[in-house]
């Protein structure tokens, strides 16, 4: 059976593993998922990301990050643009998540970027998710 929204599945796997205090989580790989994982790593929400080639689609392994006292770094993940209701923003309407404390992940003509990069480059696109 095919999955209707693989990005939502990826974000849900991260959210559930994070809530259960797991060390890492695996998901089927895709270019979009790799880009999202790299953004989460660069923004400090996850510790590391690893790609495993299994002679098929590949697997993306995300290593979650926690504070010294076990406090979760990712307090929330929300899918915004869904297959049934795509959400696009113009360059002058790029959202701020929690007044800049979180990030919006946006798919633009220049690749998958954060809201800060989209605002700096003055480009809009499809709002994939909010992370805070």
Swiss-Prot record:
**A single GO BP annotation from the record?**
translation
InterPro entries associated with the record: Ribosomal_uS8, Ribosomal_uS8_CS, Ribosomal_uS8_sf
Gene3D superfamilies the UniProt entry points to: 3.30.1370.30, 3.30.1490.10
Q: Does the keyword RNA-binding apply?
A: yes
Task: Tell me one GO molecular function of this protein.
Answer: rRNA binding
Q: Which UniProt keywords apply?
A: Ribonucleoprotein, Ribosomal protein, RNA-binding, rRNA-binding
- At the top level, the lineage of the source is Bacteria
Please name the Pfam families in this protein's record: Ribosomal_S8
- Asked whether the UniProt record includes Ribosomal protein among its keywords, one would answer yes
Instruction: List the GO cellular component terms.
Output: ribonucleoprotein complex; ribosome
**Family label:** Belongs to the universal ribosomal protein uS8 family.
- What is the protein's known function? One of the primary rRNA binding proteins, it binds directly to 16S rRNA central domain where it helps coordinate assembly of the platform of the 30S subunit.
List the HAMAP family hit by this protein, alphabetically: Ribosomal_uS8_B
Q: How does it assemble?
A: Part of the 30S ribosomal subunit. Contacts proteins S5 and S12.
**Which NCBIfam families does this UniProt record tie to the protein?**
PRK00136.1
- Supply the name of the protein: Small ribosomal subunit protein uS8
- State the organism of origin: Limosilactobacillus reuteri (strain DSM 20016) (Lactobacillus reuteri)
- Provide the taxonomic classification: Bacteria, Bacillati, Bacillota, Bacilli, Lactobacillales
Gene this protein is translated from: rpsH
